[in-house]
């Protein structure tokens, strides 16, 4: 990308006619804006390809991710969104979700010497959001704390670019090559190491939710590997099940441990997790 400040694609400007806009994120093939317009408040996602560096191979799929997410939103029956192409990739816009993400909300639990236990009601709202996706026959594939937005009325599960469960246009589709390794289930890590690809599952989503609850409540990753380790080293640690001996305080502890079981068949279902919390 050029060094000049990024701008929204013309087609998005024409569609939304922003009154205000704020660049929230611009890294590794993805830009996100918060946009206010006469139509309402929107998140605008713009993708572009990642060029190869000494540390990273080229990643052309990042250019397709916003349109792929838009196609998923369409299949799931969402409204008030759009997606399309621009000269360096694809874009989408969708309603802005107000609230703090899971990691932000549980920050008081992670303070040194804190006696604050994570609230089971917050965990239950995250479970409900994931359960609604699973009930429609889809898996998320990229469950992590930043993707749960706990709003005033409900919790939203966002960022569906890697979701699987139905057809998306071939021109926007790409293989699943794993997710953020901190939340990647061991079986997913092993498949990516062996073949370069994997098939996301409900069981892997459950693991990722458990890892999300753990790190948000304690500040510790589920698996043990050095801070700043290369992704390959991280993934190898996950694949071998090198579990960190840390537990969530309070009533969530045993449940999160079960969700992080190394064998997918030993993890509770989303229904069982919800029942345990309610």
Model segments located where?
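ATP-binding glycine-rich loop module of kinase domains
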Residues: 28-71
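Catalytic-loop of the protein kinase fold
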Residues: 134-150
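A conserved short helix/loop substructure at the end of the activation segment
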Residues: 261-272
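Activation segment/activation loop of eukaryotic-type protein kinase catalytic domains
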Residues: 151-182
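Short beta-strand micro-motifs within the conserved protein kinase catalytic domain, predominantly
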Residues: 80-91
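Conserved short submotifs of the Hanks-type protein kinase catalytic core
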Residues: 89-101
């Amino acid at each position: 990308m050029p060094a000049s400040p990024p701008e929204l694609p013309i087609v998005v400007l024409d569609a939304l006619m922003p009154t205000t806009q704020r660049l929230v994120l611009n890294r590794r093939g993805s830009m996100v804006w918060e946009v206010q317009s006469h139509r309402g408040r929107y998140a605008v996602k713009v993708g572009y390809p990642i060029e190869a560096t000494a540390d990273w191979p080229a990643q052309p799929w990042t250019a397709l991710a916003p349109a792929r997410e838009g196609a998923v939103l369409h299949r799931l029956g969402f409204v008030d969104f759009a997606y399309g192409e621009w000269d360096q990739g694809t874009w989408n816009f969708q309603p802005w979700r107000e609230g703090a993400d899971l990691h932000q909300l549980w920050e008081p639990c992670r303070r040194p010497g804190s006696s604050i236990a994570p609230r089971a009601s917050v965990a239950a709202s995250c479970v409900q959001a994931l359960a609604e996706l699973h009930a429609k026959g889809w898996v998320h594939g990229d469950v992590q704390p930043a993707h749960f937005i706990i709003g005033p009325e409900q919790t939203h599960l966002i960022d569906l670019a890697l979701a699987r469960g139905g057809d998306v246009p071939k021109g926007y589709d790409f293989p699943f090559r794993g997710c953020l390794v901190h939340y990647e289930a061991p079986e997913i890590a092993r498949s990516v190491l062996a073949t370069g690809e994997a098939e996301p599952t409900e069981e892997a989503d459950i693991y990722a939710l458990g890892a999300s609850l753990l790190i948000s409540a304690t500040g510790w990753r589920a698996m043990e590997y050095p801070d700043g380790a290369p992704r390959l080293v991280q993934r190898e640690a996950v694949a071998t099940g090198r579990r960190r001996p840390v537990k969530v305080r309070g009533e969530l502890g045993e449940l999160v441990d079960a969700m992080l079981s190394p064998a997918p068949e030993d993890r509770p279902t989303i229904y069982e997790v919800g029942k345990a919390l309610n």
